[in-house]
Amino acid sequence: RNADFVFNLAGVNRPENPEDFMKGNFGFANTLLDRLKTYNNKAAIMLSSSIQATLAGRFGDSEYGRSKKAGEELFFDYARETGAKVAVYRFPNLMGHSRPNYNSAVSTFCWAVANDEPFTVNDRSTELELLYIDDLVEGMFDLLEGKEVHCEFEGVETVLTETGRYCCVPVTHKVTLGEIVDLLEEFKQQPTTLMMPKMPEG
């Protein structure tokens, strides 16, 4: 009711039924915005969306992406209606502190390699854009201070522009699934080979 800033990081990403994507992501966003309207609270609000909302490339048939896209449009409509500041972030894949075998390929691979557990890589050439969770948090502090970075999207590519209606954390890393697995295997063998894997910059 008296919030000065609202972060909407909630979302459904592994439902039992595909239709629950829309109920959980769009439905909750709608409820949240209605509650703000009820109390005439025009606090700035942030939406955690996904690169899948571009519905481009391999995300073209993503029910999750469609639900996130619907939530985005709801937020943009809310901004036009109320004049409130809205910051919509289309996050790529996240890496960092997270639980394996849930929704982070990097965490799953790290855990599997470290514990000699089997894992599957369907296509080693698949490229991921990764955002480190600590960089995401830093980006949220920047948003609170009015220093957010704006962008638009060309397919799944982020294009920085001061007039963009989206926001982004510009520090990301692009790597293939095969490169991730190979690097993890090199780290695992380091006590035997005594060779430190080559670390990418950044």
List the predicted regions and their residue ranges.
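Mid/C-terminal beta-alpha module of Rossmann-like enzyme folds, strongest
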Residues: 142-202
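Short-chain dehydrogenase/reductase
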Residues: 22-26, 61-69, 99-103, 130
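A general structural motif
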Residues: 2-3, 42-43, 116
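NAD(P)-dependent short-chain dehydrogenase/reductase
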Residues: 76-88, 92-128, 133-146
